[in-house]
A protein has these predicted regions:
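Short hydrophobic alpha-helical segments enriched in small aliphatic residues
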Residues: 45-48, 67, 86
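Hydrophobic alpha-helical signal/anchor motif
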Residues: 1, 9, 15, 28, ...
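Phosphate/pyrophosphate-binding catalytic cores of soluble transferases and nucleic-acid-acting enzymes
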Residues: 78-79, 97-419
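Short linear motifs in low-complexity or flexible loops
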Residues: 10, 21, 45-48
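Residue-identity detector for glycine
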Residues: 5-8, 17, 39, 56, ...
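Short linear segments in intrinsically disordered or otherwise low-structure-confidence regions
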Residues: 40, 62, 70, 75-76, ...
């Protein structure tokens, strides 16, 4: 980090009072950040231009963010593009739909466990009711993750428009909040064409984010996240949980001590918003307005579902999952590909690295996928308003039952938006 005008943080008199021998300016910033999180530094603000450090006391978020400690904007602790430490985060766009809402428009969501035939049912519904499909599977968002995610090929999509599919580069980070914003934009476009949106996928959190909304937290800061992950690597994953407990005990109580991802986000919100994340979550969420949501659930027989899962996994490896994984890992930035930790890709990576044999990888993927399907059903059974249909989505009889049900509810071809 360059020192531009005014001497920078390394020459600041309050920092000079600490013992940081042989530290570059960047190192000093890291040390200041870590000491603040540890609660070993206190910043006194009796006068806005006279700050001092003293060990043993925990400063408030507002005090540590005081701009006079970092007089040059280029040398503040965080300078993320959309807000950072010491700078109030800019207001997020209000979640909602583009344009005025006059009458409720229909929206279909197909839910159920993996390998239940949700994609086949979505195609049948979209074809019969003039719909467009919106993906809510977190892995299918990424380009290059095709075989392991069960992504339909262009030919298999039967000419029906698909959205939020192959829309991200492998290294891009994507949150439930990001998904909600993109999905709302897609919904507005589909509505403008007077067509029926049909959501299909397996990431229940994404669907919940669209329908129920998320708390209005600050945008993520990659710089802050990098620093927090660095602390976890140096001091262990439980370390972040202990820090969070100091700032927001209520949030820490809901997060497992070794869940680094959730701890990082909770700390990020506490720091950037200068408010405990638990308080922000308690303020409520803004749900989806202007749509009549119909949720259709597939409830396949458990034994047959497990058989289908086992067969699908075998077919994935036979179709080239190892080669797809090897190609992804051959890229220079492969370590940043979050989706490589997904089911199938994780086991295939172990084979590529020589840590697992192929038969063991297939079996491990089958067992893990069966458990995942069970968790999916548990998740969706806690969701309100789902109409369940016994069977698989690729069964023509089930497809007819679902389409007849949707028509009976008033959803017809070329929905005008009024029901």
């Amino acid at each position: 980090m360059k020192n531009r005008g005014g001497g920078g943080i390394a020459n600041h008199p309050q920092v000079q009072g600490k013992r940081y021998p042989n530290c570059r300016q960047f190192d000093v910033l890291e040390l200041c950040f870590e000491e603040w999180l540890l609660g070993q530094v206190s910043v006194h603000t009796s006068h806005p231009n006279s700050l001092s450090f003293s060990p043993g006391m925990k400063p408030s978020i507002e005090e540590v963010g005081h701009a006079s400690l970092f007089p040059n904007s280029t040398t503040r602790l965080f300078s993320a593009a959309r807000g950072g430490f010491g700078n109030p985060a800019p207001a997020r766009p209000t979640a909602g739909l583009v344009g005025p809402i006059e009458m409720a428009a229909p929206l279909i969501a197909i839910v159920g466990p993996t390998a239940a035939g949700k994609s086949a049912l979505a195609l049948a519904v979209a074809a019969s009711l003039d719909g467009e499909i919106v993906n809510y599977d977190s892995v299918q968002l990424y380009r290059g993750f095709d075989i392991g995610s069960g992504k339909l090929s262009r030919q298999e999509r039967c000419g029906i428009p698909h959205h939020l599919l192959d829309c991200l580069d492998a290294e891009e980070q994507f949150t439930a909040g990001d998904y909600r914003r993109e999905a709302l934009s897609v919904l507005a476009e589909i509505r403008a064409r007077t067509r029926l949106p049909v959501f299909v996928g397996g990431t229940g959190l994404y669907l919940r984010a669209v329908f129920m909304g998320l708390f209005d937290g600050p945008p993520r800061s990659e710089e802050l996240r990098r620093r927090l992950r660095g602390l976890a690597e140096r001091r262990g994953r439980e370390f972040l949980h202990r820090l969070l407990k100091r700032l927001d005990a209520a949030a820490a109580a809901r997060i497992q001590p070794r869940d680094t991802q959730k701890a990082v986000r909770a700390l990020e919100v506490c720091i950037l918003a200068r408010t405990p994340i638990s308080k922000m979550q308690a303020r409520g969420r803004s749900g989806l307005e202007g749509y009549r949501v119909v949720k259709v659930g597939l409830n396949p027989e458990r034994k047959e579902l497990c058989q289908r899962i086992d067969k699908r996994v075998e077919e994935m490896f036979a179709r080239g999952l190892l080669e797809e994984t090897r190609a992804l890992r051959a890229r220079r930035d492969w370590s940043r590909f979050k989706a490589l930790g997904a089911l199938g890709y994780r086991q295939a990576s172990a084979v590529v690295q020589g840590q697992l044999g192929l038969p063991e990888a297939v079996l491990e993927t089958q067992v893990a996928t069966r458990r995942y399907a069970k968790r999916q059903m548990t998740w969706f059974r806690h969701e309100a308003g789902i109409v369940w249909f016994d069977g698989f989505g690729d069964d023509p009889r089930v497809q007819s039952q679902v389409i007849d049900f949707l028509r009976e509810t008033g959803i017809t071809v070329r929905c005008s938006g009024a029901l």
